[in-house]
Amino acid sequence: MLVNNGGGLPQGDTDNPELIAQPRGGTPAVIDTREGLEKASRALAQGSTPIALDVERAQGFRYGSDPYLVQIRREDVGSFLIDTHALPDLSVLQPGVEDVWLLHDCLQDLPNLRQVGLRPSALFDTEIAARLVGLERFGLAAVAEQVLGLGLVKDHQASDWSVRPLPKEWLRYAALDVELLTELYYRLSKRLDQMGRWEWAQQEFAHALSVEPPTAKPDRWRSLPGAGKIRSRRGLGVLKALWETRESIARRIDMSPGRLVRNAALVRAASNPPPNKRALMSINEFRSPIARQYEDEWMRALASVAALTEDELPPKRKPVQPGSIPEPRQWVRIDEASAARLGIVRSAVASVAASVGLAPEVVLAPQVQRYLAWAPLDPSRPSGDEVEERMVTRGARDWQIDLTLDPVCDALGV
């Protein structure tokens, strides 16, 4: 299907998307000075169109998920590429971005944008919108193909954006990431309105703005691939100590922990705890040029575990957090009645989802479905009250409750 795009974009074809190779107006120069930032602020403040934003990080290379480049575009002003390593405080831009923000998968980027001093006043997320109109592929490039008939090359998504200077080809890619967001906003907004789902989208955007960044889970070392095969408490103690040491070193040298020592090496060491330095160095990853610099710290970690009594070692099973719900695959073993209820809830939600042409997880999040099913309902309470209360407690939006409350209650017989 041919698509007559606006904003100076070429005509698209959803059956044969045209690849967008260059940003309109060319690739902007990187802003890395205070003077350049203030100039950008004045320019953005003159615009009246929505604000398209994106963030590039260096995950897998640096420790954590700090932003290294922020891209901003207003159709009536142009695009800006801002080096947030050189300019970690972008709050001077705030007066010029007091309009609706356009993001794709906003939960990835909002924490970084807040980190650099920017706060949204309103939001439109093109990924959320794509899900609500029934698209089955949600990546930015896929949405652009399906809605605009235009293609984007996603070849630097996992690059090390902390390198300086940034290659010109990477900057072109970064500018293209905000090139199509405004046209997507116009077209997806129209579809949402035509389908009677604009209010659904507004509720989703408001919810996204209210989401707090996730806190680090306790005992993250237990989630390493292969950790479940370690049977001894001593081995688990070694895994915990090496993981914590790796975190400490990686944070100190600003390196992704997996680049310092791979997860598999930690698990291997914990499966057969090395009694001495020679045994530890027999594991290839620990004698790499980087990891070997910290051999004394690795050995201190091992020695600290060797000095622990059995009672001081980690338990074989991860401690259950109060109020936590087990993984669904464990339900049949733990509580067959809860497993049966989950099947009923899932079936009811899937039926509703099919009737409106959406994925079940869009109609009601899996964690909400699990919360509905895990504990028995109180038979003394009025029909449906407890189900609705549980939905609200777990963050279901009004439109989701309106769609699913009665079908779920009917399925559960309440």
Report the location of each language-model feature.
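An anion-binding catalytic pocket shared by soluble metabolic enzymes
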Residues: 66-69
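Accessory DNA-binding and partner-docking regions appended to nucleic-acid-acting proteins
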Residues: 5, 168, 188-414
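N-terminal accessory regions of nucleic-acid-interacting proteins
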Residues: 1-51, 55
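Conserved phosphate-coordination/catalytic loops
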Residues: 31-35, 175, 260, 363
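A structured, charge-rich N-terminal accessory region that forms the first stable segment of a protein
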Residues: 59-62
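Active-site-proximal helix-loop-helix substrate-binding element of RNase H-like nuclease domains
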Residues: 10-16, 20-30, 71-95, 99-182, ...
